[in-house]
Amino acid sequence: INPNMIVAGGGSAGGHLAAACGNIEGLDNPKENLKISSVPNALVLLNPVIDNGPNAFGYRRFKDRYTEISPIHNISKGAPPTLILIGTKDKIIPVSTVKNYQTNMKTVGSRCELVLYKDVGHAFFAKPPLKYFIETTLEIDLFLNSLSFITGSPTINKQYQY
């Protein structure tokens, strides 16, 4: 395992966990070997919960402590390159939130690619038709290839028979 090619990813709450690992400092267990970073080298986030602030997902649960666990409120220089995939009709994660996240990432000099899928909602990639699973898999492949984490042409394409 190449420790310089660790990718964290997830959808929805899993995307929150991955983004937290990449952006929030101080989550290490004091008993672990702190010489080994637990910060991933890249993030792949599908309709991620990245804002836990007022009027956002999870705020009622965390209230004033949201800044401790809200990825969008913890972006800093050195944040890992990130790919975000989301539907334009997501009723849980507003597109404006992921656009703000992308802006914040660019402000600190970190790469953040955003791919919008027209007229689909939350978790669109995990529901029929299979075309969205294929399309998101292709985008992830291209992103990881652009980072040289994988090489070669994608083995899947948008014309895949599903």
Q: What annotation goes with each model-predicted range?
A:
Residues 1-62, 66-67, 71:
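Primarily recognizes the serine-hydrolase "nucleophile elbow" in alpha/beta-hydrolase
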Residues 16, 86, 122:
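Histidine-centered active-site/metal-ligand motif
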Residues 99-162:
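C-terminal catalytic histidine-bearing segment of alpha/beta-hydrolase fold enzymes
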Residues 78, 83-86, 90:
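Short beta-strand/loop motif that positions the catalytic acidic residue
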Residues 6, 82, 112:
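Hydrophobic anchor at the start of a short beta-strand
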Residues 91-100:
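Conserved alpha/beta-hydrolase "acid-adjacent" motif
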Residues 42-46, 83-85, 115:
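Hydrophobic/aromatic beta-strand patches that form the interior of the parallel beta-sheet core
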Residues 71-79:
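Conserved serine/cysteine hydrolase catalytic core
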